[in-house]
Every structure is written in structure tokens, then in C-alpha cells.
């Protein structure tokens, strides 16, 4: 294997990492009662969006909106309500919809649905929906499929922010809301390999865009940052080579439970940064001063 074929392997920030959930981030230890959350890309039971919605239900979120391009099944809605009850929480309100985040009209219509159902309040927005093109070289790629990755991952993120950021800010100001936006990026943004360039570069754009968003609207009450969900075999990875998919070590719960844990409490110093869900969160908290003083976990180019 040549150096151009080999993925760049980067050291994890924490000494300890996790492939699945662990007690420190357990949703059962969080209290999100009274909170209203929205998660995109939540239709697949083996996916990060569904795991995240389940974690919020188990953490006691009062209302959860879930959306996906393929729609949300009635079974999934029932399972979310059951997850809350099984965790000893009140049954959560669940709002679901079929939404194409790359289309403004689709997003705007669902925004009205959520606003009415949630009493014009929203505490947490998790932008998880994504598209990944089949692995191929740039010249061999289908241009429409290749560019769809950017339409969903970048344009879709812009549409969701344009629609729901005012609700996050308003809830923060009037109802002591959390005002948290978590954008799901990827460790792929930090490395390069043959194939999948559209996905990797779109997630790289998400990192910088989120940093800019937090800078522009942090003073309005927004706290925005990115997470890497981990290397998880989900429906999103179906276009990756099967030998690559079979080596992915993480479970959806490491992403879902970490995201719910991150959303349960505002930590202003995380604004604009990149957090990898498999990292040990107790260690991340213990290294806060190092991260802030060194302005770490942000994009930088050294000369």
C-alpha cells in the first residue's frame, strides 16, 4: 500500500477511549426534563440519529422532534416513548416528519410544525443528517451524486440553522433554554485517502462553519460545536468498501449517549470546537484548561 492509499491515522486526544457507552455519560444520570430537542437523520435503527433520540428520551427530554428524508416510522416513535418509560421517565412527546434538509421549503414547513408542537421553544438542535457518495475518484464520480453530498451536508446545515437558530436563541433568552447546536462532523475531515473526497471535504467545511457560527451568534446565546460520532457501521457507510465497514469498531450508543451528555449542560468553552464521541469525557473535562489556553480542538494550519 502506497502512502497515498493509506489513511492518515491521528492520535486520539484522550488516553482512554470507548467503543460503546459507559457510566460517566449514561443518560440515566442526566436530567433533561422540560427540554425540547430536534434531531435530523433519525430514521435508521442502527444509526446515530436514532441512538441520539433514544438517549435524549432516556435522559428525560420532554419533547423530541425527529426527521429524515425517508420519514420516521410509527414503530420508531413508539420505541422512543417506550425508552423514556423504561428509564423511569415520563413519556416524551415525539414529533416526526419527512424532511429533505437540502430543500428550504421542506425545512421551513417542518419548522412550523415543530414550533407549534413545542410552544415555539427549542433547547437543542442536533444536525446529524448526512449524505456520503460512493467511493470513487473525482473524475469517475457521478457529478450529481458527488455534489449531493455538499447539498445535504453543507447546504442542509445552513437551511436547518436558518430555520431553527432563531428559536434556539429566543428560547435561551425567554425561557432559560440551553441554546445548544451540535453539528455531527467526522474524523474523515481530518485525513485524506482515495475516494470519498466530497464527504471528507464537506465535513471539513462543517468544522470551520460551526466555529464561525459560534463566533457570530455566541453573544446571542448560541453554543455551537461539532462532534465526531465515531467509526460506526451504519446505513450512511453503505457506499464504503465492505472491508472498510467491517473494521469500524464503534457502536451507535457511544455517539448517542455522548451527544445527550454534551447537551445536558452548557459548557461555554466547548464553543466552536471538535469533540470526538469515543474520547473519554471525564478526561476531556479534566483537560479543560489545556484546551482553552492552547485553543485546541479547532482547525489550524501550522507554518
Mark where each language-model region is.
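Conserved glycine-rich Rossmann-like NAD(P)H-binding loop of the short-chain dehydrogenase/reductase
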Residues: 61-77
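Canonical Rossmann dinucleotide-binding motif of NAD(H)/NADP(H)-dependent dehydrogenases/reductases
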Residues: 25-65
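C-terminal helical subdomain
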Residues: 10-21, 226, 243-303
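The beta1-alpha1 cofactor-binding region of Rossmann-like NAD(H)/NADP(H)-dependent oxidoreductases
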Residues: 74, 97-110, 143
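Amphipathic alpha-helical dimer-interface segment in Rossmann-like NAD(P)H-dependent oxidoreductases
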Residues: 112-116, 152-176, 214-215
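Catalytic Tyr-X3-Lys loop
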Residues: 123, 131, 139-158, 181-182, ...
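Catalytic loop of short-chain dehydrogenase/reductase
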Residues: 169-219, 231-232
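Conserved mid-core segment of classical short-chain dehydrogenase/reductases
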Residues: 108, 115, 132-147, 166, ...
Amino acid at each position: 500500500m502506497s502512502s497515498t492509499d493509506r489513511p492518515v491515522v491521528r492520535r486520539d486526544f484522550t488516553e482512554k477511549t470507548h467503543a460503546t457507552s459507559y457510566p460517566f455519560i449514561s443518560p440515566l444520570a442526566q436530567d433533561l426534563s422540560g427540554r425540547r430537542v430536534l434531531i435530523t437523520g433519525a430514521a435508521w435503527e442502527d444509526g446515530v440519529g436514532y441512538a441520539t433520540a433514544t438517549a435524549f428520551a432516556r435522559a428525560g427530554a420532554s419533547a423530541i422532534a425527529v426527521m429524515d428524508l425517508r420519514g420516521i416510522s410509527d414503530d420508531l416513535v413508539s420505541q422512543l416513548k417506550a425508552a423514556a418509560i423504561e428509564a423511569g421517565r415520563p413519556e416524551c412527546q415525539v414529533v416526526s416528519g419527512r424532511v429533505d434538509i437540502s430543500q428550504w421549503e421542506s425545512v421551513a414547513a417542518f419548522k412550523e410544525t415543530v414550533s407549534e408542537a413545542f410552544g415555539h421553544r427549542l433547547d437543542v438542535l442536533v444536525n446529524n443528517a448526512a449524505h456520503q457518495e460512493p467511493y470513487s475518484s473525482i473524475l469517475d464520480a457521478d457529478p450529481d451524486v458527488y455534489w449531493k453530498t455538499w447539498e445535504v451536508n453543507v447546504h442542509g446545515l445552513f437551511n436547518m440553522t436558518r430555520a431553527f437558530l432563531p428559536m434556539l436563541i429566543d428560547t435561551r433568552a425567554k425561557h432559560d433554554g440551553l441554546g445548544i447546536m451540535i453539528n455531527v462532523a467526522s474524523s474523515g475531515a481530518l485525513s485524506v485517502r482515495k475516494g470519498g473526497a466530497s464527504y471528507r471535504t464537506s465535513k471539513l467545511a462543517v468544522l470551520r462553519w460551526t466555529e464561525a457560527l459560534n463566533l457570530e451568534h455566541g453573544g446571542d446565546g448560541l453554543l455551537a460545536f461539532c462532534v465526531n460520532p465515531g467509526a460506526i457501521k451504519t446505513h450512511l457507510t453503505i457506499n464504503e468498501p465492505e472491508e472498510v465497514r467491517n473494521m469500524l469498531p464503534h457502536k451507535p450508543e457511544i455517539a448517542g449517549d455522548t451527544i445527550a451528555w454534551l447537551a445536558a449542560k452548557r459548557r461555554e468553552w466547548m464553543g466552536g470546537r471538535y469533540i470526538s464521541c469515543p474520547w473519554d469525557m471525564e478526561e476531556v473535562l479534566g483537560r479543560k484548561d489545556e484546551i482553552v489556553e492552547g485553543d485546541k480542538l479547532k482547525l489550524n494550519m501550522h507554518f
